[in-house]
Amino acid sequence: MAEFVRAQIFGTTFEITSRYTDLQPVGMGAFGLVCSAKDQLTSQAVAIKKIMKPFSTPVLSKRTYRELKLLKHLRHENIISLSDIFISPLEDIYFVTELLGTDLHRLLTSRPLEKQFIQYFLYQILRGLKYVHSAGVVHRDLKPSNILVNENCDLKICDFGLARIQDPQMTGYVSTRYYRAPEIMLTWQKYDVEVDVWSAGCIFAEMLEGKPLFPGKDHVNQFSIITELLGTPPDDVIHTICSENTLRFVQSLPKRERQPLANKFKNAEPAAVDLLENMLVFDPKKRVRAEQALAHPYLAPYHDPTDEPVAEEKFDWSFNDADLPVDTWKIMMYSEILDYHNVDAAAQEGENGGS
């Protein structure tokens, strides 16, 4: 039985196994508190995320279960990886992942990025998205603060709690407004992996300019800012809007022409502008895919088709439509955690030659 120790962080009880020491608060999210710590077993710095009251409601239980399943399934250099998970005696859940020193939001607010860093960061974002999308997963909430970076400029995408299945009927909006694809914002009926490419395009533009590309005050203002630059959406795209109110709003706007992005990004090289043009397209069907974007000339210094892996198997979303009571989610969660530790123990035994 693991020994647990308690610490008070921001008035919150952190109850962790004695394997972890030197707890320091890193950040507070909507669903949990994150601390850095030292892993006594590996001597590595780690991030420990406490999921607050994961079993308080069926919705929270399902969200936590989804994040756990995704973290277990997604294994890629540009995706944050799970190194431990446990349930404390108080029945809080703790995810332990690798610790990266900063995130893209902090980098962007501290100084302008040089060209080679912009290229390398965008390459890694798209490399991660290619893998995630091949697993049948859409992140849906890609933004600079969800993109972690270490001192070697290695980049990892995190926070898959809002991720959803690739589903033609996906609806609702979840991502931070500035980076939200128009098909989510306008509640068009269908959206898919292309929403992440739009978000990546907004992040790319922010790296080039040093400030958000579409800083809308609300949804109406956001859409207006987008059309000022990209013009009015084509009619065939407008007709995919399901909400009558949204459709009337879009049709009431003055017609605008798309502006050449080269006029706005005067300091960017033509190849960068060309890739951005292909990422920020109203029609999701005409928006470049992550795999195609990786092969764009702008990313030629890093592109290596033999080192841009896809997922070995699709993620199993069969649980996602389930409407289950908290106790059932809890049993499923315990089962997943036991499975994680059994698989982990077997892998370590294999590495040690079965000794």
From Swiss-Prot:
Encoding gene (name): HOG1
Residues of the active site: D141 (proton acceptor)
Reactions this protein catalyses: L-seryl-[protein] + ATP = O-phospho-L-seryl-[protein] + ADP + H(+); L-threonyl-[protein] + ATP = O-phospho-L-threonyl-[protein] + ADP + H(+)
Activity control, per UniProt: Activated by tyrosine and threonine phosphorylation.
GO molecular function terms attached to this record: ATP binding; MAP kinase activity; metal ion binding; protein serine kinase activity; protein serine/threonine kinase activity
Alphabetical list of InterPro entries matching this protein: Kinase-like_dom_sf, MAP_kinase, MAP_kinase_CS, MAPK_p38-like, MAPK_Sty1/Hog1, Prot_kinase_dom, Protein_kinase_ATP_BS, Ser/Thr_kinase_AS
Protein name as annotated: Mitogen-activated protein kinase HOG1
Modified residues (Phosphothreonine): T171
EC number: 2.7.11.24
Record's comment describing the protein's domains: The TXY motif contains the threonine and tyrosine residues whose phosphorylation activates the MAP kinases.
Protein family according to the UniProt entry: Belongs to the protein kinase superfamily. Ser/Thr protein kinase family. MAP kinase subfamily. HOG1 sub-subfamily.
Sequence ranges assigned to domain Protein kinase in this UniProt record: 20-299
Cofactor: Mg(2+)
TXY, short sequence motif: residues: 171-173
Alphabetic keyword roster: Activator, ATP-binding, Cytoplasm, Kinase, Magnesium, Metal-binding, Nucleotide-binding, Nucleus, Phosphoprotein, Serine/threonine-protein kinase, Transcription, Transcription regulation, Transferase
PTM summary: Dually phosphorylated on Thr-171 and Tyr-173, which activates the enzyme.
GO biological process, one term: osmosensory signaling pathway
Main location: cytoplasm
Pfam families in UniProt: Pkinase
Function: Proline-directed serine/threonine-protein kinase involved in a signal transduction pathway that is activated by changes in the osmolarity of the extracellular environment. Controls osmotic regulation of transcription of target genes.
Superkingdom of origin: Eukaryota
